[in-house]
């Protein structure tokens, strides 16, 4: 393929990605990871939640493959709902510029009352997802499964 054609193809792909309705990541991925650590002490293996099943990680499609994947689908849907709140428009457009406030006490997560409407909503999306993760078994066979083949 001619290099100019590759550039056009790349531009189209980037354009399509930019216009798709992929839910934004947590306000602060590190915060979400810390929430996971609070509830499920997993060390470096917490990253395994970022490429699991059809919904854990960027994007998501098809039918969730198990309970843990359903937790991630619900989390994606929660973020989509947050995107509909007028209070969240500026926060979600630049998600790493702000963080929500929460506490971890003996494995229990609480979103603090000092969060504004959007941060409270997103904190609860993340808290609910992490609580769901804690109750769902992790199946090593569903890590990095290849979305194209398995998530239609």
Swiss-Prot record:
<dbReference type="InterPro" id="IPR016090">
    <property type="entry name" value="PLipase_A2_dom"/>
</dbReference>
<protein>
    <recommendedName>
        <fullName>Acidic phospholipase A2 homolog taipoxin gamma chain</fullName>
    </recommendedName>
</protein>
<dbReference type="GO" id="GO:0005576">
    <property type="term" value="C:extracellular region"/>
</dbReference>
<feature type="disulfide bond">
    <location>
        <begin position="71"/>
        <end position="132"/>
    </location>
</feature>
<dbReference type="GO" id="GO:0005543">
    <property type="term" value="F:phospholipid binding"/>
</dbReference>
<dbReference type="InterPro" id="IPR033112">
    <property type="entry name" value="PLipase_A2_Asp_AS"/>
</dbReference>
<feature type="glycosylation site" description="N-linked (GlcNAc...) asparagine">
    <location>
        <position position="97"/>
    </location>
</feature>
<comment type="function">
    <text>Monomer (gamma chain): Snake venom phospholipase A2 homolog that is neither toxic nor enzymatically active. Does not bind calcium.</text>
</comment>
<dbReference type="GO" id="GO:0006644">
    <property type="term" value="P:phospholipid metabolic process"/>
</dbReference>
<dbReference type="GO" id="GO:0005102">
    <property type="term" value="F:signaling receptor binding"/>
</dbReference>
<feature type="disulfide bond">
    <location>
        <begin position="38"/>
        <end position="104"/>
    </location>
</feature>
<dbReference type="GO" id="GO:0047498">
    <property type="term" value="F:calcium-dependent phospholipase A2 activity"/>
</dbReference>
<feature type="disulfide bond">
    <location>
        <begin position="111"/>
        <end position="123"/>
    </location>
</feature>
<feature type="disulfide bond">
    <location>
        <begin position="54"/>
        <end position="151"/>
    </location>
</feature>
<comment type="subunit">
    <text>Heterotrimer of alpha, beta, and gamma chains; non-covalently linked.</text>
</comment>
<feature type="disulfide bond">
    <location>
        <begin position="56"/>
        <end position="72"/>
    </location>
</feature>
<keyword id="KW-0732">Signal</keyword>
<dbReference type="GO" id="GO:0005509">
    <property type="term" value="F:calcium ion binding"/>
</dbReference>
<keyword id="KW-1015">Disulfide bond</keyword>
<feature type="signal peptide">
    <location>
        <begin position="1"/>
        <end position="19"/>
    </location>
</feature>
<dbReference type="GO" id="GO:0016042">
    <property type="term" value="P:lipid catabolic process"/>
</dbReference>
<feature type="disulfide bond">
    <location>
        <begin position="88"/>
        <end position="118"/>
    </location>
</feature>
<dbReference type="GO" id="GO:0006633">
    <property type="term" value="P:fatty acid biosynthetic process"/>
</dbReference>
<dbReference type="InterPro" id="IPR036444">
    <property type="entry name" value="PLipase_A2_dom_sf"/>
</dbReference>
<comment type="function">
    <text>Heterotrimer: Snake venom phospholipase A2 (PLA2) heterotrimer that acts as a potent presynaptic neurotoxin by blocking synaptic transmission and synaptic vesicle recycling. May act by binding in a calcium-dependent fashion to neurotonal pentraxin-1 (NPTX1) and neurotonal pentraxin-2 (NPTX2), but not to neuronal pentraxin receptor (NPTXR). Also binds to taipoxin-associated calcium binding protein 49 (RCN2), a protein localized in the lumen of endoplasmic reticulum.</text>
</comment>
<feature type="disulfide bond">
    <location>
        <begin position="78"/>
        <end position="125"/>
    </location>
</feature>
<dbReference type="InterPro" id="IPR033113">
    <property type="entry name" value="PLipase_A2_His_AS"/>
</dbReference>
<feature type="disulfide bond">
    <location>
        <begin position="42"/>
        <end position="46"/>
    </location>
</feature>
<dbReference type="Pfam" id="PF00068">
    <property type="entry name" value="Phospholip_A2_1"/>
</dbReference>
<keyword id="KW-0325">Glycoprotein</keyword>
<comment type="similarity">
    <text>Belongs to the phospholipase A2 family. Group I subfamily. D49 sub-subfamily.</text>
</comment>
<keyword id="KW-0730">Sialic acid</keyword>
<keyword id="KW-0964">Secreted</keyword>
<dbReference type="GO" id="GO:0050482">
    <property type="term" value="P:arachidonate secretion"/>
</dbReference>
<dbReference type="GO" id="GO:0048146">
    <property type="term" value="P:positive regulation of fibroblast proliferation"/>
</dbReference>
<dbReference type="InterPro" id="IPR001211">
    <property type="entry name" value="PLipase_A2"/>
</dbReference>
């Amino acid at each position: 393929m001619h290099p100019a054609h590759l550039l056009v193809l790349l531009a189209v792909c980037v354009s399509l990605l930019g216009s798709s309705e992929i839910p934004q990541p947590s306000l602060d991925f590190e915060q979400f990871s810390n929430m996971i650590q609070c509830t499920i002490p997993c060390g470096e293996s917490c990253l395994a939640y970022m490429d699991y099943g059809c919904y854990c990680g960027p994007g998501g499609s098809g039918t969730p493959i198990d309970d843990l994947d359903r937790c991630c689908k619900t989390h994606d849907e929660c973020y989509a709902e947050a995107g509909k709140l007028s209070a969240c428009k500026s926060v979600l457009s630049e998600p790493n510029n702000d963080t929500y406030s929460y506490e971890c006490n003996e494995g229990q997560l609480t979103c603090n009352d000092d969060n504004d409407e959007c941060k409270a909503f997103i904190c609860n999306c993340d808290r609910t997802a992490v609580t769901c993760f804690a109750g769902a078994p992790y199946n090593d066979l569903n890590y990095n499964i290849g979305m194209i083949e398995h998530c239609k």
